[in-house]
């Protein structure tokens, strides 16, 4: 019935309403920090960590919105923010002129050292990307500039003496899997992050990556992972149905107590 009448106005209307429902159900492309679960995840981590001294890495810092929230929840933690584009890094520094708790590094992270071309979308600069969604509405009639930027890896920076992160957040518009690939030694070592947050969604399509690949790597390192919702993380084994490219955040942890907090069990 539905297949045979998919062009009819009532059936099309039902499909539109169902898609709206599913977007909300999946917490898809919802960026209000205090309502999409990101604030909840930080609060859970802060509660679990107690008063211990923490190192936090914010990879893909943009203007520092996530770093500010992490600092508010964990004022004694030191946050290192990585912002690959020099113009955006300058704005980040201008917003935090005297922040002793914050170190800003104008460098990108990837799976190898070198240089990459980054598309700076001046009209929508939260969509800046190494592999941009160039056919999306965000890039239609936009003021774009390509900038060559240096990149390193998490493992390389730690080998050079950077303190390893207790909490690692990655939001780099589709390059997230490459950043995590560059931390394989960290993830399997004695100083692996207690919690990892990374963005997953249709930004991964131009980059040619799958959650299946990254999930397998994290699972091999002993992590459990799941999608972040406003008041819980749904930890579960990966299934092909999870490869839906709906924008959102994935949380990965190894500690059972932290997992229980994030699952909304306490």
Language-model features: where?
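Phosphate/nucleotide-binding beta-alpha loop and adjacent structural elements of enzyme active sites
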Residues: 1-266
């Amino acid at each position: 019935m539905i297949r045979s009448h998919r062009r009819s106005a009532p059936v099309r209307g039902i499909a539109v309403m169902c898609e709206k429902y599913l977007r909300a159900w999946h917490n898809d492309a919802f960026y209000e920090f205090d309502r999409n679960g990101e604030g909840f995840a930080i609060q859970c981590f802060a509660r679990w960590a107690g008063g211990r001294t923490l190192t936090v890495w914010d990879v893909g810092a943009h203007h520092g919105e996530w770093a500010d929230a992490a600092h508010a929840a964990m004022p004694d933690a030191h946050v290192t923010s990585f912002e690959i584009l020099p113009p955006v890094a300058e704005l980040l520094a201008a917003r935090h002129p005297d922040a002793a708790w914050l170190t800003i590094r104008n460098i990108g992270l990837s799976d190898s050292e070198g240089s990459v071309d980054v598309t700076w979308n001046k009209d929508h600069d939260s969509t800046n990307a190494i592999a941009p969604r160039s056919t999306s509405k965000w890039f239609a009639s936009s003021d774009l500039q390509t900038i060559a930027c240096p990149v390193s890896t998490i493992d390389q920076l730690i080998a050079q003496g950077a303190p390893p992160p207790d909490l690692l957040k990655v939001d780099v518009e589709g390059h997230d899997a490459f950043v995590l690939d560059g931390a394989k030694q960290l993830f399997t070592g004695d100083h692996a992050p207690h919690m990892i947050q990374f963005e997953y969604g249709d930004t991964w399509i131009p980059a040619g990556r799958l959650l299946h690949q990254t999930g397998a790597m994290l699972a091999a390192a002993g992590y459990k992972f799941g999608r972040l919702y406003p008041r819980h993380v749904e930890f579960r084994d990966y299934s092909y149905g999870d490869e839906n490219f709906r924008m959102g955040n994935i949380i990965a942890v190894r500690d059972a107590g932290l997992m229980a907090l994030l699952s909304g069990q306490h």
